[in-house]
């Protein structure tokens, strides 16, 4: 049995064509079903639906053989015990620093001000600001980052930005790009050794589908 870990939403939707290229189709819609283990048209493949932040953990410990996870999640996780053979080029966005429209970010940096930053990407943010020689206080939140600067909790946010619409709606502006984000295929290293004959065709089909879309 091959187990593939996925999260609901955009990643699942954009992974569906890749699964189809490998001859795999979910028999139930995760948005409509309460089931967390979904059968597929192949008796030897099942999908498990987990939180996006948990995908690397399920794969790392062998509860899943394969998974699809964003670079943002993998960077925070650290990627221990995971083989990352392929950038799937899906669920693309950017990790950005954003502030209120009236906040002088560049001036604050020049003055050496100690900024307060809200984010759920604490590890990535810490490494980014340290590389710039900036002193910041990081405050971890799990959602609604945009609210932080508006109510005085923080001077800036570090978050994922797709179109920038949410920032504009909350009178925020992006001032710095940290990294491009896309989703990656991750593989349990032990599974790759023990189940290579089963996993390699799936990995190859994903790679061919990604190449065809570029």
From Swiss-Prot:
The protein, known as: ATP phosphoribosyltransferase
Chief localization: cytoplasm
Family matches, as InterPro entries: ATP_PRibTrfase_cat (IPR013820), ATP_PRibTrfase_CS (IPR018198), ATP_PRibTrfase_HisG (IPR001348), ATP_PRibTrfase_HisG_short (IPR024893)
Gene Ontology cellular component terms for the protein in this record: cytoplasm
Family, as annotated: Belongs to the ATP phosphoribosyltransferase family. Short subfamily.
Highest taxon of source: Bacteria
Known partners and oligomeric status: Heteromultimer composed of HisG and HisZ subunits.
Keyword terms, alphabetized: Amino-acid biosynthesis, ATP-binding, Cytoplasm, Glycosyltransferase, Histidine biosynthesis, Nucleotide-binding, Transferase
Function summary: Catalyzes the condensation of ATP and 5-phosphoribose 1-diphosphate to form N'-(5'-phosphoribosyl)-ATP (PR-ATP). Has a crucial role in the pathway because the rate of histidine biosynthesis seems to be controlled primarily by regulation of HisG enzymatic activity.
Pfam family, one: HisG
Keyword Phosphoprotein: no
EC class name: transferase
CDD domains found in the cross-reference section: PBP2_HisGs
Lineage start: Bacteria, Pseudomonadati, Pseudomonadota, Betaproteobacteria, Nitrosomonadales
GO terms (BP aspect): L-histidine biosynthetic process
Stored PANTHER family: ATP PHOSPHORIBOSYLTRANSFERASE, ATP PHOSPHORIBOSYLTRANSFERASE ATP-PRTASE
UniProt entry tagged with the keyword Nucleotide-binding: yes
Pathway: Amino-acid biosynthesis; L-histidine biosynthesis; L-histidine from 5-phospho-alpha-D-ribose 1-diphosphate: step 1/9
Subcellular location: Cytoplasm
GO MF, one annotated term: ATP phosphoribosyltransferase activity
Annotated domain remarks: Lacks the C-terminal regulatory region which is replaced by HisZ.
EC annotation from Swiss-Prot or TrEMBL: 2.4.2.17
């Amino acid at each position: 049995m091959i187990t593939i870990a996925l999260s609901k939403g955009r990643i699942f939707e954009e992974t569906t064509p890749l699964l189809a290229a490998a001859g795999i189709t979910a028999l139930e819609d995760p948005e409509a079903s309460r089931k967390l283990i979904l059968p597929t048209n192949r008796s030897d493949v099942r999908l498990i639906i987990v939180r996006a932040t948990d995908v690397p953990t399920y794969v790392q410990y062998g509860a899943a053989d394969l998974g699809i996870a964003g670079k943002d999640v993998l960077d925070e996780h650290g990627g221990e015990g995971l083989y990352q053979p392929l950038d799937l080029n899906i669920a693309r966005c950017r990790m950005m620093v954003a502030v209120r429209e009236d906040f002088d970010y560049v001036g604050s940096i020049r003055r050496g001000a100690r900024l307060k930053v809200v984010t759920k990407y604490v590890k990535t943010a810490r490494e980014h600001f340290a590389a710039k020689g900036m002193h910041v206080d990081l405050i971890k939140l799990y959602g609604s980052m945009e609210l932080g600067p508006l109510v005085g909790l923080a001077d800036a946010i570090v978050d994922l930005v797709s179109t920038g619409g949410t920032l504009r709606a909350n009178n925020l502006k992006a001032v710095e790009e940290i990294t491009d984000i896309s989703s990656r295929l991750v593989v349990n290293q032990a599974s790759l050794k023990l189940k290579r004959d089963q996993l390699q065709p799936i990995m190859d089909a994903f790679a061919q589908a990604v190449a065809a879309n570029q």
